Design a protein with these regions (language model features):
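Short, structured patches in soluble enzyme cores that scaffold and shape functional sites
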Residues: 119, 141-143, 198
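C-terminal interaction modules
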Residues: 1-28, 49-54, 78, 102, ...
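Short, small-residue-rich packing micro-motifs
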Residues: 65-137, 146, 151-166, 192
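Short N-terminal segments immediately surrounding and downstream of signal-peptide cleavage
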Residues: 24-41
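N-terminal post-signal-peptidase region of extra-cytosolic proteins
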Residues: 45-62, 66-72, 78
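His/acidic/aromatic-lined binding-pocket segments of jelly-roll/cupin-type domains
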Residues: 31-33, 65-66, 83, 107-108, ...
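A short, compositionally biased
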Residues: 34-38, 67-70, 122-124, 181-193, ...
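Generic short beta-strand segments
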Residues: 37-40, 70-73, 142-144
Length: 291
């Protein structure tokens, strides 16, 4: 058994254990925290007071996760997909239905902050919907990044002229970027696709690095447009505000070739710890910026 298989076996065992504990309280575990850095808190209907999140803590449906200043989180879900969120972000998994033989159907809400979603298996049978305050984002077997709020507006304003004339709402504006897998990804993975719907209009993103921006509630998406290298770096900095000292994976790889991110993090006190799930898509062999 190779290292990746052992890592996933460990994650599955952890989820099975926490799933049993969750079942005792009526909450089914759908994932586990793979990275926790600095101030990350969780609340739900059973425990409305937000409490600190720790590494390898189970996540259940409807758990509301919030990050503080300079903080970040990665959640590994049962189907090997993952969510990463940056500082001052809010995430909730609203729906999760997974059958290994038929694929996944899941839904989540991001009401502020920057995020990355990575499909565990890069094929279009795995459908995910992410809701922001102004848009619905459909994801079909791929890797997607985005931001909600002032950070999204700042990035988009530097990308296309239409955004500067759109009177963006700095609380709810939403930027979405399709990241991959790219056409040159090995292992026969699907390129995947994403859609952004708002104001009765849907924009399709079918190529890596294509983006769309929704400036405010009721407005049609602006795009698709190709995000610049500078804009992509700004988005990456919002998703991953913390860099491991000495460079390494987070210091250089994120800006040069943002591939599927192994888990990293700490116990909530800022001290890095490591929990490394395997890369769920093929090794990139194309140009930087594609998976």
């Amino acid at each position: 058994m190779n290292r990746n298989s052992l890592l996933w076996l460990g994650a599955a065992t952890l989820l099975a254990t926490t799933g049993y504990a969750a079942a005792q309280t009526g909450a089914a575990a759908i994932g586990v925290t793979a990275s926790v850095i600095k101030d990350v808190r969780l609340s739900n209907a059973r425990s409305p007071k937000a409490r600190p999140v720790v590494l390898r803590q189970r996540i259940a449906l409807a758990d509301l996760i919030q990050t503080g200043q300079g903080s970040q989180l990665q959640v590994l879900l049962l189907d090997r997909s993952s969510f990463s969120i940056g500082a001052n972000a809010t995430l909730r998994i609203d729906r999760f239905v997974y059958d290994p033989a038929r694929g996944r159907n899941s839904g989540a809400s991001v009401t502020r902050g920057a995020f990355r979603f990575m499909s565990g298996q890069a094929n279009r049978a795995n459908n995910t919907a992410i809701s922001s305050p102004v848009a619905t984002i459909g994801i079909r077997g791929t890797v997607l990044e985005g931001a909600v709020g002032e950070g999204a507006a700042k990035i988009a304003q530097g990308e296309v002229r239409e955004v500067r004339q759109a009177n963006a709402d700095k609380r709810t504006a939403t930027l979405v970027v399709l990241r991959g897998p790219g056409q040159r990804t090995e292992a026969g993975t699907d390129v995947g696709a994403a859609s952004v719907t708002s104001g009765g209009v849907t924009v399709e993103l079918t190529e890596p690095m294509m983006a769309a921006f929704v400036p405010r509630e009721g407005a049609a998406p602006i795009g698709p447009f190709r995000i610049s290298a500078a804009g992509l770096v700004l988005l990456e900095d919002q998703i991953f505000p913390v860099r491991v000292s000495g460079g390494g994976l987070l210091g250089g790889l994120l800006k040069a070739l943002p591939a599927v991110l192994p888990g990293f993090g700490g116990s909530g006190n800022g001290k890095p710890q490591v929990f490394v799930p395997p890369v769920p898509v093929g090794r990139p062999s194309g140009a930087p910026g594609q998976f």
